[in-house]
Amino acid sequence: DIRMYKADGSTFVKKARLRRFQTSRDWNHPTTFVKAKLYKKYPFRNKGIHDDYGFFLQMQSQKRKIVIVDQILANFHMGGASNHKDLGAAVKRIRDRYRYCYRINGYSRWYMIECVAIEAAKFILG
């Protein structure tokens, strides 16, 4: 889990989850630990902000063991590259997440809806 700090100083805890319907909302990249041998065996793209999530989905599709620890492992301040409010940047994030996370790992085209919904929520909720 990860403690998220908003710009106004308030916090909330974002819980990590494993569900049948995968979404980046359930994964907390700052709290992910991966064995070096997996990085060597499955090198990932490393060219965009969603490539680590693509790696996570690849590990899941390869039936690698994923463990969720019910404990806060990091504190995180919101407002990074994935939250930049720019329509062009949002369209690129939608395209990249869909292409390099979901489609490359064999997920349904329906995941485009999830990608659009995430970016729309960022614009609306801040």
What feature does the model see in each segment?
Residues F76, K85-W110:
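Catalytic core of nucleotide-sugar-dependent glycosyltransferases
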